[in-house]
């Protein structure tokens, strides 16, 4: 839990001023030619600060840890962070993936702030920014030129060429935005972004029963489900289950819930001897990095919650059960508390495979680990 809170830092001073470094030119993952500005925090009619401004590591795939855990333990934080992220966009046009020194880093991919902001609103926690303004800001960032990083090809074909990982992320983010549109009564926007969230289906490969990357001509990039090419720090075995918004559809494509769970169970059996800890893009299941952090909970969506219970226990004991860096967090990508957040959720027996981003958020209940 200490790591879960350590990853965010206030950047505003006691007088309410904060640095704005959003005005500059993108150079790869960073920004150059920055024009530094000093801005002032918003205040209410009584002169009280409405919200603070924050730095953080990227919110990449935090729908499976921080978005859920913050709402349970520190419900003010999703509200604070959402308002801060929207303020960044007000200043510089883009919603940060991970705000750094008052500006952008472009580290990781997509618009990972969307599930965080949507979950804050759909759980009734958004108080410090206007929901409609937040929605319009995210909508702008889900179009070409926005932080989601999509182009016209994605809008036309539904998938990111040569990258199944980015497709899975973008589709989930589009689904999350559609869920907020439902709550706001924006039926046309809900339908539009909902339709965009189905593109991953074009990457389903029947002969492998997994999602694989395709190029612009619709050709598969490779045949190896354990190869990381076309994924982001993952592979087909790890990333396929990340279509959290449409797991029943994935099960149907695989031939039904029994085959769906049988395939996932095989992956866990293969990963268990290595304690579910692998390097980027390696192994069948990895709890050393973000892309697989929901996988053990997926069995519940396949009608076999006892397998979720079994593998959650195994993962929590083997991957997160130690007290040293190489045993407690898989010796890998803890980032801003994400692996610690997954372990905490496993221990308290609560999770949300959809990151509490649904129009009616749902928690999955497991047994408490004493």
Positions of PLM-derived features:
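Aromatic-rich carbohydrate-recognition surfaces in CAZymes
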Residues: 55-181, 194, 237-252
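Catalytic cores of carbohydrate-active enzymes
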Residues: 96, 178, 184-292
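Carbohydrate-binding/catalytic loop surfaces
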Residues: 102-117, 153-164, 211-234, 278-295, ...
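Glycine- and aromatic-rich loop/turn segments at beta-sheet edges
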Residues: 34-50, 90-101, 145-161, 205-225, ...
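Function-dense linear segments that define catalytic or interfacial modules
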Residues: 1-54, 74, 123-126
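Extended, well-ordered alpha-helical scaffold segments
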Residues: 76-86, 127-142, 186-201, 256-271, ...
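Conserved small/polar residues in nucleotide/adenosyl-binding loops
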Residues: 369-370
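Catalytic cores of secreted or luminal carbohydrate-active enzymes
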Residues: 303-318, 334-365
